[in-house]
UniProtKB/Swiss-Prot annotation:
UniProt subunit comment: A double ring-shaped homohexamer of HslV is capped on each side by a ring-shaped HslU homohexamer. The assembly of the HslU/HslV complex is dependent on binding of ATP.
Matches recorded under HAMAP family: HslU
Record carries keyword Electron transport: no
Natural source organism: Rhodospirillum centenum (strain ATCC 51521 / SW)
Family (UniProt): Belongs to the ClpX chaperone family. HslU subfamily.
Protein name: ATP-dependent protease ATPase subunit HslU
Gene Ontology terms for molecular function: ATP binding; ATP hydrolysis activity; peptidase activity; proteasome-activating activity
Amino acid sequence: MTSFSPREIVSELDRYIVGQHEAKRAVAIALRNRWRRQQLPEGLREEVLPKNILMIGPTGVGKTEIARRLARLAQAPFLKVEATKFTEVGYVGRDVEQIIRDLVEIAIGLTRERLRKEVASKAELRAEDRVLEALVGANASGETRQKFRKMLREGQLNDREIEIQVQDTSVQGLPTFDVPGMPGAQMGMINLGDIFGKALGGRTKVRRMSVSESYDVLMAEESDKLLDQEKVVSEAIQSVEQNGIVFLDEIDKITARSEVRGGADVSREGVQRDLLPLIEGTTVNTKHGPVKTDHVLFIASGAFHLAKPSDLLPELQGRLPIRVELKALSQEDFRRILTEPEASLIKQYKALLATEGMTLDFTDDGIDELARLAADINRSVENIGARRLHTVLERLLEEISFTASDRSGESVTIDAAYVRGQLQGLAQNTDLSKFIL
């Protein structure tokens, strides 16, 4: 769990996302409250429930990007999922409880990685012994083993090919099926690979690879042998229950508009009804055991382009008490997006073309013209937010990208005149620009 202060979280998000301070503050406070809750006495800790967030804003203003960056900051089980992927219980498709099952799998992966670090030194010695056995055989003398161990540690044998016995993971890819009549009926998807893996007693197969490649494989195997799998699962479930975060994107797409109800929209409303107990707090059965969702934080977001937030079920609105509106992007925002973030689009294109030996130089008036064009096209055609910059830059640099491999060593300056020359038709003919995306 991250111990960043809200101010630190916002400044971290500022490195990648321009503007939207209200949304950044809301998620920063929510994330910090997770840490604050952990410091409370146990009795009070159970009473403090997370305040779920609803982010509203037009497409392309940074809702999903905030979620992506938050996932890296959270240091907790985090799942980003689209609400449109789910269907009402009883229909063909995935039901919303699958969200928690997926979150548990993510938590198990995170917990295993953390616990592997604790046994890394032991696992490294065991992996080294297995590599030595493959190199010199099981019956080699101690002197020979020591000689090869020294060469191994100095990296002299990294390119040597060896054959090693590793776990056969091919059974893991077998299909899954629902088990009828199990508690909760959705206990779901028992993996045939798990069943066959246990029945076959963990089959092994011989793989041929270089010494350097074998280390990662053997380290993972030996670490897992040293880990208590039950401890991994119980810690992962505890982590989900106390620190889990779910980001529900495109929630506006499952609203039934007030003037159009019936038909397929009933199924959409069904998904909302299924989400109610999940967000409020329920127990979900997974193959690893029951998981309580009382303290899982839900952040929902949607453009609400055709529907309104009030079209959500009133009960669902009540379970998303913190409402944050993200603002549409202006010309000045576009300019900042092109220049300020650590991995801004201009830096990306410069780096890509530098691999061909070309130097790109954007002047200030060239960047201003790009921002103005993007804002104009968004106003006159369809407002798709910052994604419009991808369209404009791809069109602008199309010729340069195509011929870059033949122009190594050249330097190209992109100023306002160059931008107008390349994108003249795009700016003048709005009907034509509809065909770009």
